[in-house]
């Protein structure tokens, strides 16, 4: 833990917390799960676009630096949070739902982040799933597995009533 804390502080990390105490751990997990509402409070009328990145732990610093630079270059309000011990972090981007340009900028940012994670040997999504926004990367990342995935989906959902179009058309 001390080594992790030193690494965090050596890379401008702050407020490093961990606990062996059950109650304190629950508070830390609650804080992690309340991130959405904390971010939303920064700009109450905004919407939140959440994405994630997952890379080998050895590539984590580079990926986060890439995300930070893109966020800064695009002037986005986008806190980065995560439980980075597994190489996974989340970016929560605030945007104006009335401004179509905002959403397009965010989608481009998200796509650049996915391409960077793949370049670094990571995956297009850590926890958020493929869904609609990362469908295009599934074939790129897992080309030899697509037919197997489709056959499993067809076996479980022969009428295609569970999340139609979310991953496979």
Regions found by a protein language model. Name each.
Residues 1-109, 116, 120:
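C-terminal substrate-recognition/cap domain of FAD-linked oxidoreductases
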Residues 17-32, 124-140, 168:
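Short proline/glycine- and acidic-rich turn/helix-capping motifs at secondary-structure junctions
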Residues 23, 48, 125, 133, ...:
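Residue-level signal for pocket-adjacent positions within structured domains
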Residues 51, 89-93, 128, 134, ...:
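A structural signal for short, well-ordered beta-strand segments
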Residues 101-105, 109, 130, 140-144:
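Short amphipathic alpha-helical interaction segments
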Residues 111-113, 152:
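Alpha-helix-loop-beta-strand connector modules within alpha/beta enzyme cores
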Residues 118-130, 143, 158-162:
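Alpha-helix capping/hinge segments and adjacent helical runs
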Residues 134-169:
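Activity-critical C-terminal alpha-helical subdomain
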């Amino acid at each position: 833990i001390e080594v992790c804390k030193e690494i965090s502080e050596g890379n401008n990390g702050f407020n490093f917390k961990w606990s062996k105490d059950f109650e304190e751990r629950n508070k830390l997990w609650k804080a992690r799960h309340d991130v959405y509402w904390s971010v939303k409070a920064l700009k109450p009328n905004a919407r939140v676009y959440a994405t994630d990145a997952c890379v080998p732990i050895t590539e984590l610093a580079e990926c986060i630096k890439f995300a930070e630079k893109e966020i800064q270059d695009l002037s986005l309000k986008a806190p980065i949070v995560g439980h980075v011990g597994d190489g996974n972090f989340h970016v929560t981007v605030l945007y104006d739902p009335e401004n179509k340009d905002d959403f397009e900028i965010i989608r481009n940012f998200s796509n650049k982040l996915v391409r960077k994670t793949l370049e670094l040997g990571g995956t297009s999504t850590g926890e958020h799933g493929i869904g609609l926004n990362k469908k295009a990367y599934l074939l790129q990342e897992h080309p030899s597995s697509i037919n197997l995935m489709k056959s499993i989906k067809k076996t479980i959902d022969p009428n295609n009533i569970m999340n139609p179009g979310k991953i496979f058309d």
